[in-house]
């Protein structure tokens, strides 16, 4: 949103009433439509006069499969209705890697149905399928850091050997901005991921090493971690990993290491660099400068 505004674009956001991000959005030069993706009037108002639509909404915290399916199916139908009415020039959508109508995971399967609706709509579109993202406030890395700082525990779901490809959210934004302009991206489903293939345990080890905090590594079954996550989410608390993230850990989410470079012309930020400069305050890194492997000033967001 900030980068679109900085580029001189007029931005309108559809945001649920009571959303944690609403007050933050209100402090920026954007138009705000308050409502839900399942509210036809709100969706129509958000789409009215728009040239392009970027669909990022996903009911990740929702545990009830029927609700998830309804949001994916009916929410997409309303968005497409609004997009047709205003004759949008391009419709962008972001989904997790592995999304598809034949997926064994209910979330990815119903998200796949939504993707199919977009492909069949005839509206010029780009679908980005992303590996797990990290950034300030995320569950994958920020949640891990929060748990480690508070308890000294590194909690590893299962064996921790599922292969992942974490991508900094700022790099996903760069892909989106380029997909808005790139004619070669039109009517394609494009996989994107970070610059490294890492297991969950390797991610945890790298983060713990950067924090330099004495830690105890505990492996729990995914079932146990999932139960803890459901209880915490049911209490309105923010667990270090959400239930949906644990589902994705069952299958892994990776693509080619050069996927972003081939499609969008830049190399994503490595995990250690992204954590150092976009999640951890500098005081937590220590007085010796950036961690090994991080070169200060090698690449800024605007250079991507």
Question: Residue locations for each model-derived region?
Answer:
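Substrate-positioning beta->alpha
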Residues: 139-140, 159-181, 187-191
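NAD(P)H-binding glycine-rich loop region in Rossmannoid oxidoreductase-like domains
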Residues: 19-20, 24-78, 82-84, 97-101
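Conserved Rossmann-fold NAD(P)-dependent oxidoreductase catalytic core, especially the SDR/UDP-sugar
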Residues: 12, 59, 68-121, 125-131
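N-terminal Rossmann NAD(P)H-binding glycine-rich loop of SDR-like oxidoreductase domains
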Residues: 1-9
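A short C-terminal helix-loop "cap" of Rossmann-like NAD(P)-dependent dehydrogenase/epimerase domains
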Residues: 145-157
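Flexible, glycine-rich beta-alpha linker
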Residues: 103-105, 126-143, 162-163, 198
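Conserved glycine-rich Rossmann-like NAD(P)H-binding loop of the short-chain dehydrogenase/reductase
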Residues: 9-17
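Mid/C-terminal beta-alpha module of Rossmann-like enzyme folds, strongest
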Residues: 178-242, 255-304
């Amino acid at each position: 949103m900030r980068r679109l505004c900085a580029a001189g674009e007029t931005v309108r956001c559809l945001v649920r009433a009571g959303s944690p991000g609403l007050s933050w959005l209100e402090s920026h030069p954007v138009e705000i439509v308050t409502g839900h993706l399942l509210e036809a009037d709100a969706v129509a108002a958000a789409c009215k006069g728009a040239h392009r639509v970027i669909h990022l909404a996903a009911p990740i915290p929702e545990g009830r499969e029927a609700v998830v399916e309804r949001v994916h199916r009916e929410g997409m139908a309303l968005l497409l209705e609004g997009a047709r009415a205003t004759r949008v020039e391009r419709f962008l959508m972001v989904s997790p890697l592995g999304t598809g109508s034949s997926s064994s995971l209910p979330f990815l399967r119903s998200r796949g149905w939504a993707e199919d609706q977009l492909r069949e709509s005839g509206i010029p579109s780009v679908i980005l399928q992303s590996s797990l993202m990290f950034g300030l406030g995320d569950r994958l890395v920020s949640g891990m850091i929060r748990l480690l700082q508070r308890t000294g525990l590194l909690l590893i779901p299962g064996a921790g050997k599922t292969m992942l490809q974490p991508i900094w959210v700022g790099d996903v934004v760069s892909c989106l901005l380029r997909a808005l302009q790139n004619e070669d991206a039109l009517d394609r489903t494009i996989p994107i991921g970070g610059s490294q293939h890492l297991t969950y345990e390797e991610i945890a080890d790298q983060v713990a090493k950067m924090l330099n905090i004495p830690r105890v590594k505990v492996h729990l079954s995914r079932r146990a971690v999932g139960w803890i996550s459901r209880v915490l989410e049911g209490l309105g608390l923010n667990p270090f990993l959400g239930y949906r993230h644990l589902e994705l850990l069952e299958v892994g989410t990776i693509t080619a290491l050069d996927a972003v470079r081939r499609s969008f012309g830049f190399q994503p930020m490595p995990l250690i660099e992204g954590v150092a400069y976009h999640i951890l305050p500098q005081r937590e890194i220590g007085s010796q400068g950036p961690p090994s492997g991080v070169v200060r000033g090698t690449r800024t967001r605007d250079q991507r």
